Amino acid sequence: MKKTKDIGICAIDIYFPQTYVNQSELKKYDKVSNGKYTIGLGQTNMSFVGDREDIVSMAMTSVKMMMSKYSIDYQSIGRLEVGTETIIDKSKSVKSSIMSLFQEYGNTSLEGVDTLNACYGGTNALFNSLQWIESSYWDGRYALVVTGDIAVYSKGAARPTGGAGVVTMLIGPNATLIFDQSLRGTHMENVNDFYKPDLSSEYPYVDGKLSIECYLRALDKCYLEYKKKFESINDDNKFSMDSFDYVCFHSPYNRLVQKSYARLIYNDFLQNPNNPKYQDLLPFKDLSTGKDSYINSKLDQITLKLSLDDFKTKVNPSTLLSKECGNSYCGSVYSGILSLLSNVNDLNNKKVLVFSYGSGLAASLFSFRINNNKNRNNNNNNNNCFFKTTNDIGKISNIKERLSNRVKVSPEEFTRILDIREKSHQMVGARTPIDTLDYISAGTFYLEKIDEKLIRHYKSKPIISSKL
């Protein structure tokens, strides 16, 4: 196979549930201080599901939606890889269940399985797919990356940081979002900031303060790794946030995204402390990126103020889905990319920096550039001529209208549904979900039953066509 170029994301879409709870209403129900969820966390609404939907049904819906909206031939997919930490079977992969969609069209030749590492699995699945297309093993077909989760927490302070959603990406040559080859900063270490050792429960064990410190430390490390590679390739250019038009972050909650961009500005200062625009940060020069810098409120205050204008233009356009749907774990940073494409019209030639983080921990800083030129030379490969502009992708995904058509559920009903979901997850044996199908939209897969062999059976809610 002839070596290809301009590899990246050709299309991207997301499935999120029809139901959501409003964070202001949840705050009142939880009897916490005003603004704790909306200002303290920076969240607006939160998606959730009952016992009728699981990671398999959501992933299947996301894939089928992508294939249908873009009229993609199922035979044109040669790799399908899933990134998720929502585990419903200790052996059977989510990818194997998605195969039922491809078997229907006679395609059983698809490489890839599931990748697991907290919220980082989708990024690893993406990297694997990019490298597959770059390799001698590539057979000329597209890759499909499916990534997302159902994030649920027990009652308490962490519950409003939940969410749900699954992103699907079509990866191939001659892409619209072209990844920068050789530019990637990665940091990994062994730490117990967030983990799920109790397989009878969906709820994680979380050390909130440690997790924030780990996130920011990983960001610091990835910044330095990326900077080193960037400057080795671009001899005359120094790496800084000025090198990019937009930045997307993994978003447990939006306030952490704000702090993270401010942290990158602080890293810029440490690399160039004599720049006059950073004069307010000079007292922190010797603090560097040590542990004390993660809990220094004065430093936070100054960096947030310094970075605010840039945050509004460079980062805020990518936060729509995370603020509206909450944390989709593996899908979070990619929902940020889709939000950006949906919010900004003129993205041609723009450069985007992306930070992906998964607890435990694994993190990467990487980048892509956008090419909306429909007249590009496309003789690179036989049938890989699929091309959509970022405006096309935004219109096809139609996330703003879809968000507005969701069903708002009261905090009382939200709590009741999650209680049912918790009890259902702990049950072993044949059972039929009891949650209503009224909240399942047409064309969505749902869990019909679990039989006596504990095999899960899914159905798609019929699409009823109206006739005159």
Swiss-Prot record:
Binding-site positions, (3S)-3-hydroxy-3-methylglutaryl-CoA: C119, T161, S211, H250, K259, N327, S359
The keyword Transmembrane appears for this protein: no
One function term, GO molecular function aspect: hydroxymethylglutaryl-CoA synthase activity
Pathway: Metabolic intermediate biosynthesis; (R)-mevalonate biosynthesis; (R)-mevalonate from acetyl-CoA: step 2/3
Keywords for this protein: Lipid biosynthesis, Lipid metabolism, Steroid biosynthesis, Steroid metabolism, Sterol biosynthesis, Sterol metabolism, Transferase
Domain of life: Eukaryota
Family under the similarity heading: Belongs to the thiolase-like superfamily. HMG-CoA synthase family.
Name listed for the protein in its UniProt record: Hydroxymethylglutaryl-CoA synthase B
Gene that this polypeptide is encoded by: hgsB
One of the Pfam families matching this protein, by short name: HMG_CoA_synt_N
Active site: E85 (proton donor/acceptor), C119 (acyl-thioester intermediate), H250 (proton donor/acceptor)
